[in-house]
């Protein structure tokens, strides 16, 4: 009887991602699209293999809000069950393009309305198809486990490795945009908070954080090491990773950073001046690892999920084991 009750409890619906978490992800996703589009435009114009792209913390906030609006629009697809083509190819793209044009004019704060070219309209339409066919469908299937326990499985990861890599890569782009924007604010008094990064940073941060996460699982869960014991290993690995990537990219004139004018640098690829920043980022990474452990995918192939993204509950993730693992940040 008790086993039956446990089984029923384990199959209880998991809550959807809370709104603050969705907006956090939305901001990162929007900044990533900014970097992708601006770096592609720069590469086509200048053939610059550094793949520099631009965004700002302001735009991150704007993206969080606009993505939330787009989420609400996407959830209206239940009214188009008999006409899905109209929704995916006409209704959603039209509202998406109008919203992007409106936001573009508001952000630039110009008196004259910006003229949108045919190329920009095509890009917006392609992005709208990506949002309605891929992004919303996948993102709104994510669920958030109970904050006190995690269900034990053969691997402690809640999300597939590819999705974790993408998350870490996007977060790395956001980190660099925020850092460079704050740096420009103090050094150049740039109140626009314009920041920049490189598409290569997506691969560098994604792979680095992916490996550091494995170190966290091993050192924290298996060996019981505390934060102060893990931190030196994190820092050494981060510096080694940054140097290795920088050295490789420099061979092809694709390295987007040069610390030669900073003190305590080595070959201009790493500098101890940024040590406090790496320490803070490493501590924050442990928190992110614990949060991601609680995010899982809904494995059910339901055609419609009308409550996805709302404050209700989603369907459970298939068969779940009964063993539970307490997770904390130590």
Name each region found by the language model.
Residues 1-330:
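Aromatic-rich, lipid-facing transmembrane alpha helices and their immediate juxtamembrane interface loops
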């Amino acid at each position: 009887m008790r086993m039956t009750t446990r089984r029923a409890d384990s199959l209880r619906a998991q809550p959807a991602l809370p709104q603050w978490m969705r907006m956090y992800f939305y901001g990162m996703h929007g900044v990533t699209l900014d970097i992708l589009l601006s770096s592609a435009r720069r590469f086509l114009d200048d053939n610059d293999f550094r793949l520099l792209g631009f965004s700002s913390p302001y735009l991150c906030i704007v993206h969080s809000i606009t993505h939330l609006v787009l989420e609400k629009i996407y959830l209206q697809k239940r009214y188009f069950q008999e006409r899905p083509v109209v929704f995916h190819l006409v209704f959603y793209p039209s509202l998406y393009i109008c919203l992007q044009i409106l936001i573009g004019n508001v952000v630039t704060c110009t008196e004259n309305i910006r003229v949108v070219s045919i190329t920009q309209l095509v890009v917006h339409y392609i992005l709208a198809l990506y949002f309605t066919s891929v992004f919303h469908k996948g993102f709104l299937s994510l669920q958030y486990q109970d904050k006190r326990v995690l269900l034990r499985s053969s691997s402690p990861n809640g999300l597939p490795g590819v999705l974790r890599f993408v998350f870490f890569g996007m977060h790395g782009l956001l980190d660099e945009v925020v850092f460079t924007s704050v740096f420009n604010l103090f050094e150049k008094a740039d109140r626009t908070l314009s920041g920049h990064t490189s598409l290569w940073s997506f691969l560098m941060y994604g792979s680095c954080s992916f490996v550091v996460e494995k170190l966290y699982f091993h050192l924290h869960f298996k060996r019981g090491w505390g934060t102060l014991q893990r931190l030196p290993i994190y820092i050494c690995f981060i510096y080694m990773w940054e140097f290795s990537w920088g050295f490789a990219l420099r061979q092809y004139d694709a390295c987007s950073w040069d610390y030669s004018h900073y003190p305590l640098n080595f070959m201009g690829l790493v500098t101890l001046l940024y040590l406090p920043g790496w320490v803070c980022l490493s501590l924050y990474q442990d928190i992110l690892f614990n949060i991601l452990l609680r995010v899982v995918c809904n494995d059910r192939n339901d055609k419609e999920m009308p409550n996805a993204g709302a404050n209700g509950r989603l369907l459970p993730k298939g068969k779940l084991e009964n063993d539970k693992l307490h997770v904390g940040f130590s």
